[in-house]
Structure formats: C-alpha cells, structure tokens
Amino acid sequence: LSLYRPGPMEHIPTYIRRHHGLEPVSYSEFPHAEKYLKPILDETYGIPVYQEQIMQIASAVAGYSLGEADLLRRCLAEGSLVLDAATGQRVPIEKVRPGMEVFSLGPDYRLYRVPVLEVLESGVREVVRLRTRSGRTLVLTPDHPLLTPEGWKPLCDLPLGTPIAVPAELPVAGHLAPPEERVTLLALLLGDGNTKLSGRRGTRPNAFFYSKDPELLAAYRRCAEALGAKVKAYVHPTTGVVTLATLAPRPGAQDPVKRLVVEAGMVAKAEEKRVPEEVFRYRREALALFLGRLFSTDGSVEKKRISYSSASLGLAQDVAHLLLRLGITSQLRSRGPRAHEVLISGREDILRFAELIGPYLLGAKRERLAALEAEARRRLPGQGWHLRLVLPAVAYRVSEDSSAVSGSAGE
C-alpha cells in the first residue's frame, strides 16, 4: 500500500493541525489496535506517512512477515477492470467491494472463485503501462508481480520479450438467457448498425441496419418484427446496400427497436461502440449466439485465420474478452485510431470457434468457416502462429504474448 506524504490527501489537514499542536493525536477510530499503532505512528502524529509504516502495521496487527506485507504495496491503476466471478460483469477496481467474488490463481495453477475480504486504496503512485505482443494492456505499479516460466517476477525486472502467463480461459458464466431475437438484434446493430444520436438537437437515437447479405437482412427483419416493429427497406441505387429502418407499430407508440438500443446503452458513434453490459452476464449459449451474429457482420473468415474489425478499440477489447470466456484466445492489432482487429489464428482456437460459435454464423461466412475448420484439422496439434505452454488455467504465450513495457506516470 502506498500513500501520499503525509498519508492520503484527506489526512493532510489533520497532519498539519497535529504537527502544530492544534489537535491531539488520537487512535479512537481503532481502539483495539492502539497498542500496535502507537509505537509505529507516534513520530508521524498517528497518521501513516511511509510505506515502511504500513508494512510494520500489517506485520504487527495481522501477523504478516515484512516480506508478505511488502506485497500490499503492489496495486493496479484506477479504472482497471476486475471480473466479477459470480455474474460475469467487469467492475472498475475502485468499485470493488468486500463480498464480491473474484478469481484467484491457486498453487495448482487453477483459477478459483474467492470472496474479496477487504479493499485497500493506495493513493497516488507511479505506474507503468504494460503492452503485450498479443495486444493486451495493463496499468500497474512497477513492483507488481507477473507469472513467468521462471515463477513470479516483478514487472520492473522483466526485459522486453519475456513471456508472461495469461488465462487460457475465463471460467465464468452469467445467468441471463434473453430471447434469441433480442440477442440477434443487439449483435447485428452493434456490428453493422447506426445507433448514434440524430435530429436537429442530436437527441433522437437511430436504429438503422445496413447489409447486402440476404440472410442477415432476413434475420434482422424477423427479429425486429418479433419485437413488434414495422420494417422498411431502402436500396442504394449504386452500391446495392440495403438499409432496414424500423417504425413504431402504430401512431403514438414507441419504436421497440429504438427502445432496445436505449435500454442496452448502445447509443454511440462507431468509434465509441462497446458491447452492451448485459452481454457480460449472458449464459454461455447466449454468449456464443451473440458472438456468432456479431462475427456475421464485421467478422472475416480468411484462409488461415478468423478476424473481427472495428473502428472502436473498446469494442475490439470487449470481443477479445468474450472470446476468452469460451476458451478462445486471440490477438488484438491496431493499425490506427479507427482500425482495430481481433485475430484468431491458433489451431485449437479455430476449432473451438467453429464448434461453439460457428453454428450461429449467418451468410457466406458459415461456408468459409467449414473450409477453414477442415484445414485446421489437417494441422498438427500446436502447429500455428504461436506456441502455448499450457497449465491447467493459464497459458504462456511464447511468441504472440511476449511482453513489451512502456513507462508512464499516472494514478
């Protein structure tokens, strides 16, 4: 745990008053711990100022060794997302509360659901941004340990190119199982839809779907009509792209598709799109359906890989995370501020994609996936564009996940 000097910012006025004799030193907030705190904090007027004091307190009160107490200094930056193991939602670390279940790596290298016992705010510290070759990023303190083939090592001791462990799968399943029509509409609109605000004052949400694929157009129409919307089609005279617009079922009523867009929090420009929060709470079957429909839009099935492209970096990161829920590892590539791609190239990952997500693909991509699956089966196990040394719950990405570290300061 690291603190401002003196202590957290809200303790600065108290420190000043006590330093000038305007306020007595008191441990009334911790009556049972005063005998431990007083010898350690007496010289700083009852306020923790130095990291060493925190380590001494942890040792005296909780029985930690100084080495174990040193681990308390290691932290993630504000805004880092923590996976709720019970619901599948991702929670900013500053909003994590005791009782929430998270994943912890056991000594057998398996992930276990464990409850959060306490949340410690560590104030402002220098952090660095770690970027792996596979596109993952973390913002954490330089002394935060990471798992390598040689064991746990502080980030500051890792040279460029060091392989680090990442989850081979996130064993979490939500509890939501929405109707197929809702899941399909959300995925199709997220991929090939226009859901930004429009109108003279920019307050009216859009819900337009664009495609030339007859199967996608039929699926969108079917699902929109199942919600009660009227659907109108417009064909571009030059490109042949079809625009499907929805209307309210009767005068004075609300367009149910636009209502869905608002309810799901999908009102956004292309570069701002994110996977709706509800999707992170889907059961595995609903999640596979969502990803299948989404890859039917901006996804590609190529000769040796599967990819998904987006103008939104956040959306690409969300997709990579959801794939990992199904045990599919991927790489994230960015070729500009509005050009991001999720790549699936490993043999086992392609086969798993074909098994779990393939049945929900629409249009010509389904046929191309069958050909790619056949090609992947002809490869030897482990043959591909990266090598994984797989433990029960983690994988060392030896070529595609070698870490690259760039320093920065922040909170």
For every predicted segment, state its role.
Residues 1, 34-44, 55-56, 69-74, ...:
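Glycine- and acidic
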Residues 1-75:
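Alpha-helical scaffold/interaction cores of sigma-54-like transcription cofactors
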Residues 8-14, 70, 80-81, 126-129, ...:
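Short acidic, glycine/serine/threonine-rich loops at helix termini
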Residues 27-32, 45, 87-93, 152, ...:
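Alpha-helix capping and helix-loop boundary segments enriched in small/acidic/polar residues
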Residues 60, 97-98, 295:
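Extracellular/lumenal glycan-associated surfaces
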Residues 63-64, 81-84, 88, 104, ...:
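Conserved helix-loop functional segments at active or binding sites
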Residues 76-117:
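Long, charge-dense accessory insertions within large macromolecular proteins
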Residues 106-411:
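Internal intein/HINT superfamily modules and their associated LAGLIDADG
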